[in-house]
From Swiss-Prot:
Quaternary structure (record): Interacts with qutA; transcriptional activator of the quinate utilization pathway genes.
Domain-related comment: Is homologous throughout its length with the C-terminal 3 domains of the pentafunctional AROM protein. The function of the 2 C-terminal domains may be to act as a molecular sensor that detects the presence of quinate pathway intermediates as a prerequisite for the presumed conformational changes necessary for the control of transcription regulation.
Function, as annotated: Multi-domain repressor protein that negatively regulates transcription of the quinate utilization pathway genes. May mediate its repressor activity by binding directly to the qutA activator protein.
Name of the protein this chain belongs to: Quinate repressor protein
Family annotation (InterPro entries): Aldolase_TIM, Aminoacid_DH-like_N_sf, DHquinase_I, NAD(P)-bd_dom_sf, P-loop_NTPase, SDH_C, Shikimate/glucono_kinase, Shikimate_DH-bd_N
Keywords: Quinate metabolism, Repressor, Transcription, Transcription regulation
Originating gene: qutR
Species of the source: Talaromyces stipitatus (strain ATCC 10500 / CBS 375.48 / QM 6759 / NRRL 1006)
GO biological process assignments: chorismate biosynthetic process; quinate metabolic process; shikimate metabolic process
Length: 820
C-alpha cells in the first residue's frame, strides 16, 4: 500500500456526510436483524428447536440493567463463544479486527499491517472491487437482503484464502448466522481482537438519536465480545477541529497497539519479561489502584517510577460488574500508554462468586493479553484447566494468602503443598503472603524464601502485609508490592522507601559513577543520573572527571566505591582495549560509552577489577527514530536512511538503523574517504545491507531508492580542536519524501543547530525533529539501567535534563551580560 494512504485513515476522519451515512446503514441493518430475530423468537406461528432458540437469543443483549451491560454472574448469560483455545500463535496467522464503527479498526489495522509486515485487507475495498459499489450504495440500489447474500459469499471467499499472512478489518460488522459460525471457527485458529472505544468519543455532530445509537452500540459490543478472543481499548487522541492531523497524532496509538500485539505474537526483543523479574534480586511491582487509573486528573507519569512491573487488582463486586468489561480494557490501555514495564493482572475471586462469574472474569483477564496473570493457588480444578488452555503467552504467578503472619514458627509442610499446587498450574513464580501482628513476625519470611530454594527452582516472593509487615517487603527478593508516591500510607511502602531500607541496612552498597572525557564540565549526565537515583531511593552519586589523558581513567577505576563510568569524547574507541568483556553492540560499533566495574575475589586476597563495556549511543538514536517516526513512515523493506558524518557516532547511527530494520543506508561526509571506510566496514559485517556514498551536496539521490524518511546528523555543531564545525544544509533533492520523516540531531551544544532550524521549517511537510537532548536522555536511560541494574524513572530524567539545560543557558546569558 502507498505510504501516503496510511495517514489519517479511520471513520472518525471521514467527512461528516459520509460518516453519518455509513453509520446509519450499519445501525439500520443491525437493528433490523435484532427486530427480525426478536419477532422470530416471539412469533407463535413458528417453532424452533432448542438449538435454534439458543442461537437466536444469544445474539441479543439484555438491556434491562441500568447501562445495558451484561452481568458477569448471570448463569443464563453466555458472554463468550470463543473456546478455551491455547491462544499460542506463532506469527503467520491472520489478524482479524472487529468492533463498532469508528472504534478505529482501520487505523489499527494499518498499524498492525506495517508492524507485522502483512497484507492489509479491508472489507469495503474488497466489496467495491467485487461489485463496483460501496456497501451503502449497494444497499440503496439492491436492498439489504441482496447485500447480505453478497456479503456472506464475499466474506467466506476471503477467509478461505487469507487465514495466514494478513490483517483483516471491516468484516463481521453485522454478522449473519452464517458469518457467526465462520467467526466462531476462526476463533480456534486466529487471533480476533475486539476493538473498544469510549462511545462518547464516537458520537459525531449530527447524531440526533443518541438512544438508538446506544442500543446499536450495545448489540455490536455484545456480539463482537462473544466471538473475539482478545480485547483492546483504543484511547481517544484529542484533536482541535481547526487543526490538520499531525504526523505523530497516532504515534501513541501505534506504540500501545504494537505492544499489545507483542503479547499475542511475542517478539525477540520484548521488554523485560517475567524471567528477568524473578531472576534479579530485589524487584518491585507497583500497585496501581483501579480508582486512581479511572481518575482523569491522575498524574500517570507516576507509573514510570522505576518499578520492575505494574500490577492491577481485578476483582468483581456488585457495584462494578456492570462496567468491568469496559473499564478493565481501559485501565490496561492506560498502563500501556504510560509505562514501559510488564503488566500484571492480579485476579481476585471469592467464594461468593458462582462458577459462571469466575469463568467470565478469568476470560476477561486473559483477553487483555497481559504479560503476567496472578491467580490463587486454591483455584478450582476446572478453572485451572481453563487457564492452562487459554492463557496464551501470558505467564502465571500463583498466590497463596493465609490469615495470620508467616512467622518463624510457620509450618514448612505448607510450603511443599503450595509448591506442588504451583507446579500443577505451570506457574513461573509464587507469591506467599500473611498478616503481621508485630514486627518480629517478619523474620519468618526470609526463612521461607531460603527453604523454598531448597525444595524447588520456582522463584518465591514472601512477605507479610499491613503496617507491621513493611520490613518484610523491604527484604523480600522479588516482586515486592510498592505503592504510588502519591498513595503512600502506613499500610504500604513506596519504591524509594524499599530501596532506602536495603541500603540503610547494608544489603546494598552505595556506588559512584563518573562521566570521563574532555570538556565534560558542561555535561548534563551527572545531574540526570543523580536525579534518577534520588527518585528511586538509591544513595548512588554521579560526578565527572575532565582529562586530556586517557591514562587517568585508571585512577577512577581504582576508586573503592566506583561502580562504573560514562565515557564521552574522545575516548570511546580508545577505552575498548581496556575492557575484559564487551557487549555485542559495543563490539560491532567499535566503541564503548558505558563501563561497569565488577570486583572478583582472587587467591591473593585483594579483588581483581573486571571491566565490562557497553554502548548505549545506538539505543538513544534508535529510540528517537522509533518514537518520532510516524505510522505513515513505518519501517519496511524499501525504507532508506541518511547518515551525516563518518565518525564514532555515525557508527552508532548506522547500527541503530540496522537494528530498527533499515537495509538501505546512504552516508554523506565532507571527507569521502572516511565515509567509504565506514561503508566498507559495515558491508563486511552485514551482507544484506545496501550502503551508498553521497560524494558531495550536488549528488542526486539514487533513483532506485526511496527518499530517506530517517536522517541522523552525527557531526559536531561547535568547533572541536582546530576543526571548525561543518556548516551546510541538506540539499532539497535529498528531501523528497512525500510523508516527511524524522531528523535526529546528535549535538546539543548549541541545542538548536542550523540543521535543526532548517528541518523545523519543514514540519508542515511531515518532518519531526529530535534534538540532542532527546538523544542524550534516551541513551542515558539505557545507561542508567546498565549501571544500576534497575529500571529508570525516565520521566524524571527527561525533566531534569531540560531543566538543567535551561539553568545552564540562563547562567551563560547572565555571565555574558555581566561581562558586557
Amino acid at each position: 500500500m502507498d505510504t501516503a494512504s496510511i495517514r489519517g485513515l479511520s471513520w472518525s476522519t471521514l467527512d461528516p456526510a459520509s460518516y453519518n451515512s455509513r453509520k446509519r446503514s450499519f445501525e439500520q441493518m443491525l437493528l433490523q436483524q435484532d427486530s427480525n430475530e426478536s419477532s422470530r423468537r416471539t412469533s407463535p406461528s413458528r417453532t424452533h428447536s432448542r438449538v435454534d432458540l439458543e442461537r437466536h437469543s444469544s445474539h441479543i443483549v439484555s438491556l434491562s440493567s441500568s447501562n445495558g451491560s451484561p452481568s458477569l454472574e448471570d448463569p443464563e448469560n453466555r458472554l463468550y463463544e470463543s473456546p478455551a483455545s491455547a491462544r499460542q500463535y506463532y506469527g503467520d496467522e491472520s489478524l482479524i479486527l472487529v468492533g463498532f464503527p469508528s472504534a478505529g479498526k482501520k487505523t489499527l489495522g494499518l498499524i498492525a499491517s506495517a508492524a507485522l509486515r502483512r497484507e492489509f485487507v479491508d472489507f469495503d475495498t474488497v466489496f467495491v472491487g467485487k461489485t463496483g459499489l460501496s456497501p451503502r450504495e449497494y444497499i440503496e440500489a439492491h436492498g439489504a437482503t441482496a447485500y447480505r447474500s453478497v456479503e456472506d459469499e464475499l466474506t467466506s471467499e476471503v477467509f478461505r484464502s487469507r487465514q495466514k499472512g494478513c490483517v483483516l478489518v471491516g468484516f463481521f460488522a453485522m454478522a449473519s448466522n452464517r458469518q457467526r459460525r465462520l467467526l466462531k471457527s476462526l476463533s480456534t485458529t486466529n487471533p480476533i481482537i475486539h476493538i473498544q472505544r469510549d462511545l462518547g468519543n464516537m458520537i459525531h455532530r449530527g447524531d440526533s438519536d443518541k438512544d438508538r445509537l446506544y442500543r446499536t452500540y450495545q448489540l455490536s459490543e455484545k456480539m463482537h465480545r462473544r466471538f473475539a478472543n482478545f480485547e483492546f481499548f483504543n484511547i481517544f487522541q484529542p484533536m482541535a477541529d481547526d487543526k490538520p492531523l499531525g504526523p505523530l497524532r497516532l504515534k501513541a496509538t501505534e506504540r500501545e497497539f504494537v505492544r499489545f500485539l507483542n503479547g499475542i505474537f511475542p517478539q525477540s526483543e520484548a521488554s523485560r519479561g517475567l524471567k528477568n523479574l524473578c531472576s534479579s534480586s530485589y524487584t518491585y511491582a507497583l500497585q496501581a489502584p483501579s480508582s486512581w487509573l479511572d481518575d482523569p486528573q491522575a498524574d500517570y507519569t507516576e507509573l514510570d517510577s522505576g518499578a520492575d512491573a505494574v500490577e492491577i487488582l481485578v476483582e468483581m463486586s456488585p457495584q462494578n460488574q456492570q462496567d468491568l468489561f469496559f473499564k478493565l480494557s481501559q485501565r490496561v490501555a492506560v498502563l500501556r500508554k504510560y509505562c514501559r514495564v510488564p503488566i500484571i493482572l492480579d485476579l481476585e475471586t471469592s467464594a461468593t462468586m458462582n462458577y459462571i462469574a469466575q469463568v467470565n472474569l478469568l476470560e476477561l483477564v486473559i483477553r487483555q493479553a497481559p504479560d503476567v496473570i496472578m491467580v490463587s493457588l486454591d483455584m478450582s480444578p476446572h478453572l485451572v484447566k481453563q487457564l492452562s488452555l487459554a492463557k496464551g503467552h501470558s505467564k502465571i504467578i500463583g498466590k497463596y494468602h493465609q490469615k495470620g503472619p508467616i512467622s518463624e514458627n510457620w509450618d514448612l509442610t505448607n510450603l511443599q503443598t503450595v509448591i506442588d499446587k504451583a507446579s500443577l498450574l505451570h506457574c513461573s513464580a509464587i507469591r506467599l503472603t500473611g498478616e503481621a501482628y508485630e514486627t518480629n513476625n517478619n523474620f519468618g519470611c526470609v526463612r521461607v524464601v531460603l527453604e523454598a530454594r531448597k525444595l524447588s527452582d520456582l522463584p518465591v516472593s514472601c512477605y507479610n502485609t499491613g503496617e507491621y509487615g513493611r520490613s518484610s517487603i523491604c527484604l523480600n527478593p522479588i516482586l515486592s508490592p510498592v505503592v504510588l508516591p502519591s498513595q503512600s500510607t502506613k499500610q504500604g511502602i513506596t519504591l524509594a522507601d524499599a530501596q532506602r531500607g536495603l541500603f540503610s541496612s547494608f544489603w546494598r552498597t552505595k556506588k559512584n559513577f563518573t562521566v570521563f572525557g574532555q570538556n565534560v564540565s558542561y555535561s548534563l549526565t551527572p545531574a540526570m543520573h543523580n536525579a534518577a537515583c534520588i527518585a528511586c531511593g538509591m544513595p548512588h552519586t554521579c560526578d565527572y572527571v575532565e582529562s586530556d589523558r586517557l591514562a587517568r581513567i585508571r585512577e577512577v577505576f581504582e576508586r573503592e566505591s566506583q561502580g562504573g563510568l560514562a565515557i564521552v569524547y574522545p575516548y570511546k574507541t580508545e577505552v575498548v582495549q581496556m575492557m575484559d568483556e564487551m557487549s555485542l553492540d559495543a563490539k560491532v560499533i567499535g566503541a564503548v560509552n558505558t563501563v561497569v566495574i565488577e570486583r572478583i575475589s582472587t587467591n591473593e586476597g585483594s579483588p581483581k577489577l573486571y571491566l565490562k563495556g557497553y554502548n548505549t549511543d545506538h539505543i538513544g538514536i534508535r529510540t528517537c527514530i522509533e518514537k518520532n517516526l510516524s505510522p505513515a513512515n513505518a519501517i519496511r523493506s524499501q525504507t532508506s536512511a541518511l547518515i551525516i558524518g563518518a565518525g564514532g557516532m555515525a557508527r552508532a547511527a548506522i547500527y541503530a538503523c540496522i537494528k530498527a530494520g533499515v537495509r538501505n543506508i546512504c552516508i554523506f561526509n565532507r571527507t569521502e574517504a572516511n565515509a567509504r571506510r565506514l561503508a566498507d566496514y559495515f558491508a563486511t559485517v552485514y551482507t544484506n545491507l545496501r550502503l551508498t556514498i553521497l560524494t558531495d551536496l550536488s549528488t542526486p539521490w539514487p533513483t532506485d531508492l526511496w527518499h530517506p524518511t530517517i536522517i541522523v546528523s552525527c557531526i559536531p555543531a561547535h568547533k572541536v580542536g582546530d576543526n571548525d564545525a561543518p556548516d551546510f544544509l541538506i540539499p532539497e533533492q535529498w528531501l523528497g519524501s512525500s510523508t516527511g520523516g524524522v531528523f535526529v540531531e546528535f549535538a546539543y551544544k548549541p541545542l538548536v543547530t542550523r540543521l535543526i532550524r532548517f528541518m523545523q521549517s519543514r514540519r508542515s511537510q511531515g518532518w519531526i525533529v529530535a534534538d540532542g537532548l532527546d538523544v542524550l536522555v534516551e541513551q542515558g536511560i539505557a545507561q542508567f539501567e546498565i549501571l544500576t541494574d534497575r529500571p529508570a524513572p525516565s520521566h524524571i530524567m527527561r525533566r531534569t535534563v531540560r531543566e538543567q539545560y535551561s539553568i545552564a543557558q540562563n547562567a551563560h546569558s547572565d555571565h555574558e551580560t555581566t561581562e558586557t
